[in-house]
Amino acid sequence: MRVKVDREELEEVLKKARESTEKKAALPILANFLLSAKEENLIVRATDLENYLVVSVKGEVEEEGEVCVHSQKLYDIVKNLNSAYVYLHTEGEKLVITGGKSTYKLPTAPAEDFPEFPEIVEGGETLSGNLLVNGIEKVEYAIAKEEANIALQGMYLRGYEDRIHFVGSDGHRLALYEPLGEFSKELLIPRKSLKVLKKLITGIEDVNIEKSEDESFAYFSTPEWKLAVRLLEGEFPDYMSVIPEEFSAEVLFETEEVLKVLKRLKALSEGKVFPVKITLSENLAIFEFADPEFGEAREEIEVEYTGEPFEIGFNGKYLMEALDAYDSERVWFKFTTPDTATLLEAEDYEKEPYKCIIMPMRV
C-alpha cells in the first residue's frame, strides 16, 4: 500500500472513525483501523462490533492495499505532524507514516484479522443532521446507564402521527422531543451509537436512514461516510401512557433562575442524588435542601401562583439535567400529586416541542 493524503482531511476522518473503535475490548483488533487504499481513496473502517463505520478521504494512490493499524496511535501521529500532506506506505509488517521531516513506523496486523462488516445499504428516508443532533441532545441524558430492561439503554426513534419522536427514559424520568415531520421506521439506538452518530452528523445537512431486512441494523449514510448500528433488542415501553394530562398545580419558572438555585443547593450535597423539596404557596416557590451531615439551604422564587399550597420532592440532579436541555427561557412545571409524575414543558411548545416527565422522591 502506498498513498498520499491531505493531512488535515485525514486527521478529520480519523477523528470521526476512532469513536467507533473499542480500546478496552477483549479483542485487540477492535482498537485498530482497517486502512484500504483503493482507486482514488483511502478508506478507513472502524468497529466495536456495535457500530461499523466506513469513511473515506481522497488520496493519490500509487499502490493499492490494506492493513490494520492501531487507531489512537495513528490519529495522534497524524494530528501532530507539521506538514500539509501525509504519506503512508507498508514496509513488511510496518506502516510507515511520513510528513515533512518526520517518519514513524507502526506495527500492523493482517487485514483478514479485521471483523467482517455488514453490507451497508444506502438510501431510505432522509432526516436533517441538525434535527437528529437536536433530538439526541434533548433526550440522551435520560437514557438508562444500567437497567435490567435493555430497551431503556438506548434512544427510541419513530414517527408518530405528524411528528417524529425522540425518546429516552431510565424508568425514573422520560424525555420526549417531538418536532413536526415524517418518519416511517422504528429504531432503538444504543447509547454509545448516539455518541458516534452525533459526531458524524454535526453540521451535516441531510442523513439517509435505512433498516436491514432482519431489522437488526440501522444504516446511516452521507456521501462521505456510512455507519451501520446494531439496534437494541426488546420493545420500548408505552411511554405515551405515562405522560400526565390533568394537573392540580402549574407554575411557569424562569429556566436560568431555577438552574442557578439548584446549582447552589447542590453545593451542599456530595452524592449523585441530592433531594430537593419544592413548596408552592401564593406567588411563592420555596426550594429546600437538608442533610444532617452537610447542612441546610432555602431559596425563594417569586412566581405567579394562586392555587392551593403544594409540596413535592425531587432528585435535584434530574431537574438540573432536564432544564439544561431546554432552549426556552421559561419552562412550565405541571404537577399532579406529590406522589405522581410531574411534567416539564417549554413555555411555547410549538416553538420547542420538548417535554420531560420526572417521578418525585420522598424528602
UniProtKB/Swiss-Prot annotation:
What family does the Swiss-Prot or TrEMBL record give for this protein? Belongs to the beta sliding clamp family.
- Asked whether the UniProt record includes Ligase among its keywords, one would answer no
A molecular function (GO) held by this record is: DNA-directed DNA polymerase activity
Q: Give compartment(s).
A: Cytoplasm
> What cellular component GO annotations does this protein have?
cytoplasm; DNA polymerase III complex
Q: Which BP terms in the Gene Ontology apply to this protein?
A: DNA strand elongation involved in DNA replication
Instruction: State the taxonomy lineage.
Output: Bacteria, Pseudomonadati, Aquificota, Aquificia, Aquificales
How it assembles, according to the record, is: Forms a ring-shaped head-to-tail homodimer around DNA which binds and tethers DNA polymerases and other proteins to the DNA. The DNA replisome complex has a single clamp-loading complex (3 tau and 1 each of delta, delta', psi and chi subunits) which binds 3 Pol III cores (1 core on the leading strand and 2 on the lagging strand) each with a beta sliding clamp dimer. Additional proteins in the replisome are other copies of gamma, psi and chi, Ssb, DNA helicase and RNA primase.
Supply the alphabetized keyword list. Cytoplasm, DNA replication, DNA-binding, DNA-directed DNA polymerase, Nucleotidyltransferase, Transferase
- On the tree of life, the source organism's domain of life is Bacteria
SUPFAM superfamilies assigned: DNA clamp
Q: Does the keyword Nucleotidyltransferase apply?
A: yes
- Pfam families attached to this UniProt entry: DNA_pol3_beta, DNA_pol3_beta_2, DNA_pol3_beta_3
Q: What does this protein do?
A: Confers DNA tethering and processivity to DNA polymerases and other proteins. Acts as a clamp, forming a ring around DNA (a reaction catalyzed by the clamp-loading complex) which diffuses in an ATP-independent manner freely and bidirectionally along dsDNA. Initially characterized for its ability to contact the catalytic subunit of DNA polymerase III (Pol III), a complex, multichain enzyme responsible for most of the replicative synthesis in bacteria; Pol III exhibits 3'-5' exonuclease proofreading activity.
The identity of this protein, by name, is Beta sliding clamp
InterPro entries from the xrefs? DNA_clamp_sf, DNA_polIII_beta, DNA_polIII_beta_C, DNA_polIII_beta_cen, DNA_polIII_beta_N
